A protein has these predicted regions:
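Short, intrinsically disordered, charge-balanced linker/junction segments flanking boundaries
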Residues: 108, 116, 122-128
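Alpha-solenoid repeat junctions
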Residues: 25-26, 37-38, 64-68, 96, ...
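Short, motif-level signal for alpha-helix interfacial/capping segments enriched in acidic residues
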Residues: 31-32, 63
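Amphipathic alpha-helical scaffolding segments comprising HEAT/armadillo-like alpha-solenoid repeats
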Residues: 1-18, 35-50, 69-82, 101-115
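Helix-start/N-cap signature of alpha-helical segments
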Residues: 10, 23, 53, 85, ...
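Charged low-complexity stretches with an acidic bias
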Residues: 54-91
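Residue-level detector of extended alpha-helical repeat arrays and alpha-solenoid scaffolds
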Residues: 14, 27-31, 57, 88-89, ...
Length: 128
């Protein structure tokens, strides 16, 4: 795990390392270790949600959720609002579902109202 996080800190093979770290932290002890190793690196994880590669953005958001980093809930929501790729949007919501984001409830409710008035195809429903 130290190697994976070291690679992330060096911004090497980011998409693959985010995915690998997500697999590693399924174990509770590994989750605690990852949180220690990533202490103070909130900005790094947030920066990955702004990556050019859509799968990197997706994995970054999901990792933040997996790590239960509620202090980043505002950043995850901002990234959700800015995201253009539909298949990534759902990952931001999945991440938010694992975070304490009560303060975002008014914005989430507003977004839900907007979506109610949109015409959504069956193919796109899972991405919203």
């Amino acid at each position: 795990m130290k190697e994976i996080i070291g690679n992330l800190l060096k911004k090497e093979n980011v998409r693959q390392n985010l995915s690998s770290l997500r697999q590693e932290i399924k174990d509770e002890n590994a989750l605690a270790e990852a949180l220690k190793l990533l202490a103070g690196e909130d900005e790094l994880l947030v920066s990955f949600m702004g990556a050019e590669d859509a799968k990197t953005r997706k994995n970054a958001a999901l990792l933040i959720g997996d790590l239960h980093m509620s202090q980043l809930s505002d950043e995850v929501f901002k990234a959700y609002e800015a995201e253009q790729m539909r298949f990534v949007k759902g990952s931001y919501l999945a991440a938010l579902s694992q975070l304490d984001c009560k303060e975002l409830l008014p914005q989430l409710m507003e977004r839900a109202k907007e979506l109610e008035h949109m015409t959504v195809t069956a193919e796109n429903r899972k991405h919203i």
